[in-house]
UniProtKB/Swiss-Prot annotation:
UniProt xrefs under Pfam families: Phage_int_SAM_1, Phage_integrase
Keywords: Cell cycle, Cell division, Chromosome partition, Cytoplasm, DNA integration, DNA recombination, DNA-binding
Protein name: Tyrosine recombinase XerS
Ranges where the Core-binding (CB) domain occurs: 16-121
Cellular component, GO annotation: cytoplasm
Gene3D superfamilies with a match to the protein in the record: 1.10.150.130, Intergrase catalytic core
Record function comment: Site-specific tyrosine recombinase, which acts by catalyzing the cutting and rejoining of the recombining DNA molecules. Essential to convert dimers of the bacterial chromosome into monomers to permit their segregation at cell division.
Domain Tyr recombinase: 169-354
Subcellular location(s) per record: Cytoplasm
PROSITE patterns: CB (PS51900), TYR_RECOMBINASE (PS51898)
Principal location listed in the UniProt entry: cytoplasm
Gene responsible for this protein: xerS
Length: 356
């Protein structure tokens, strides 16, 4: 989604929200949470507060008038009723054969509400330096996670990774083979952003950074000589991330054409740009998602930018057998998250079975 459109949609949702949600928004913007994350959270709050009005929990005339006391006095039974409402409401699910939204969607909704409740009961301060209230009903609400072993998840993900020679093969395909399949009109469009697209995908494959971290990079964040980028991690923490050498020529090619191709001014600090009505803008996450999906589907299998992050992590673990190194590369505080990659590259169990 274009940044301008995203901000417009955020503003429309903010106009609907109660004052305490607007305070929450400002607080998280200062962390900083990304606009995309905050937009998704505001959509969840709109859904929740609409239900609060429909169910009669509040007799307010509109969402913005719902008092803080409604959240303070929300019972566990009320919140469970909301969850049942999500499960049973077919209009929320594009698949009409199902009766409600998926568990993943419900978990996302509850995560957004948990964040709001934590802010109201722990983080915010009133005039006396105390939170607005103390009772956090979300701590009493349990969520159901998808039941799947690490081995099963690893096997599923492995089919969508570009491991071994496929990493270089994917980049070569975009650079040399993909253009041969295009019509003259499509080729002209492809050539306008070829260097940029290759640079973005090479960077994702060579660093393992999150999509949001990549699109928010500024020119000053890239040290091409040292092959290091400075990113803003989740929670607003700054981090320096090493980039594999194979990405360097792609980044150099893009930088060589960036200013002229995208008509930049000194004020255009974003590393990766797109032209909108002749004006350079920072490329947005949805554009990168569509780009990765298009190229990857033509090459092998349709994947998301996050699978490119998994690809780098798996290759790095395969080369080093160090979960600590992989966790540092990905910006994780714990090695627990990297357990997945040990299962993806673990051939010992299969070899043992084959020898029986």
């Amino acid at each position: 989604m274009k940044r301008e459109i995203l901000l417009e949609r955020i503003d429309k949702l903010k106009q609907l929200m109660p004052w305490y949600v607007l305070e929450y928004y400002q607080s998280k913007l200062a962390v900083p949470y990304s606009f995309t994350t905050l937009y998704e959270y505001l959509k969840e709050y709109d859904r929740f507060f609409s239900w609060v009005l429909e169910s009669g929990i509040s007799n307010a005339d509109k969402i913005s008038d719902i008092p803080l006391s409604v959240l303070e006095n929300m019972s566990k039974k009320d919140m469970e009723s909301f969850i049942l409402y999500l499960r049973e409401r077919p209009l929320l699910n594009a698949n009409t054969t199902k009766q409600g939204v998926s568990q993943t969607t419900i978990n996302r909704t509850l995560s957004a509400l948990s964040s709001l409740y934590k802010y109201l009961t722990e983080e915010v301060e009133n005039d006396q330096g105390e939170p607005y209230f103390y009772r956090n009903v979300m701590k009493k609400v349990s969520t159901k996670k998808k039941k799947e072993t690490l081995a099963a998840r690893a096997e599923n993900i492995k089919q969508k990774l570009f491991l071994g020679d496929e990493t270089a093969g994917f980049l070569t395909y975009i650079d040399q083979e993909h253009p041969q399949q295009l019509s003259n009109r499509a080729l002209s469009s492809f050539n306008k952003n070829k260097e940029r697209d290759l640079a973005i995908i090479a960077l994702l494959l060579a660093s393992g950074v999150r999509l949001s971290e990549a699109v928010n990079l500024d020119l000053r964040d890239l040290n091409l000589k040292m092959m290091v980028i400075d990113v803003t991690r989740k929670g607003g923490k700054r981090d320096s991330v090493n980039v594999a050498a194979f990405a360097k020529p792609y980044l150099e090619n893009y930088l060589a054409i960036r200013n002229q191709r995208y008509k930049t001014e000194k004020t255009d600090t974003a590393l990766f740009l797109t032209l909108y009505r002749g004006v350079p803008n920072r490329i947005d996450a949805s554009s990168v998602e569509k780009m990765v999906a298009k190229y990857s589907e033509d090459f092998k299998v349709r994947v998301t930018p996050h699978k490119l992050r998994h690809t780098l992590a798996t290759r790095l673990y395969d080369a080093t057998k160090s979960q600590v190194l992989v966790s540092h590369q990905l910006g994780h505080a714990s090695t627990q998250v990297t357990d997945l990659y040990t299962h993806i590259v673990n051939d010992e169990q299969k070899n043992a079975l084959d020898s029986l």
